């Protein structure tokens, strides 16, 4: 099998060297070049035709966001963004994911985190090489989304799990959610410093109130709760109503927070009064949990292969019988509301 050809773009020669060395140590990857700024990178993309580009966000002359926008318009290809894990870096990275970057990786902050960060870059480059590239990501919508003004809650809650490609998918879904939407809990695989900014970004585009989940928060209609990244898993529990619970623990299915943990807790807490949704992402996280939800009587949906950036999590769930129906991303928001409506 041919090696994955990678172009590394970073204004720091040290960082280019570190990333390139880590990638070249993997037998499936070949670094074909390194560029110090977007103008140099533009010529190298034309000359070298890489399979994947790793792109620093903060660079001189032209920042990574502007360059990514040009790439996605003129020559769409898999791009992995490399960003500092700061508030400003989070905002820019979320914009990059909206524009069509496959995934983001945090730059190592110190020597102790270098090997872990470099290993993550290698893993995400491999995922990116198999990803479907969206050529119209980040484009302005032709018209404002039509939200369900007649939506009547049935008392069901909605639980959603996503990973690679989930930023665009969740934005697409939640922009259709009205102020009366069912209580919704989300686990999206994302660095800890990004989830608050991500919740705020979703909040600006949705009719619902979207917030980062806090321990003990009461689940209410019209509200969406996003699992904090990093240290805890998000669960739903019964305690004077339905509430969010943040639980410390080891990664489950390779992740913390884990979609499996969320789905299992929803099955236990509400049984058949739920809609479970598994979206684009690599791996198997969420598949077993969604099956548990379906066995408890919940309605379940999976994103279809054609609209996924990475058809991994939904495929795993579908293959074990956890998915009742596969739905395209363009129809997913409406399908969720239909299943959670008192009028169905």
From Swiss-Prot:
Keyword Hydrolase on entry: yes
Residue ranges annotated for the CheB-type methylesterase domain, each copy included: 151-343
Reaction(s) catalysed (UniProt annotation): [protein]-L-glutamate 5-O-methyl ester + H2O = L-glutamyl-[protein] + methanol + H(+); L-glutaminyl-[protein] + H2O = L-glutamyl-[protein] + NH4(+)
Location (main, coarse): cytoplasm
Active-site annotation: 163, 189, 285
Enzyme nomenclature, EC number: 3.1.1.61, 3.5.1.44
EC class of the enzyme, as a word: hydrolase
Hydrolase is among the record's keywords: yes
Disulfide bond annotation, renumbered to this chain: none
Domain (Response regulatory) ranges: 5-122
PTM entry text: Phosphorylated by CheA. Phosphorylation of the N-terminal regulatory domain activates the methylesterase activity.
Subcellular location: Cytoplasm
GO CC field: cytoplasm
NCBIfam families found in the cross-reference section: PRK00742.1, PRK12555.1
Family (UniProt): Belongs to the CheB family.
Protein name: Protein-glutamate methylesterase/protein-glutamine glutaminase 1
Phylogenetic classification of the source organism: Bacteria, Pseudomonadati, Pseudomonadota, Alphaproteobacteria, Caulobacterales
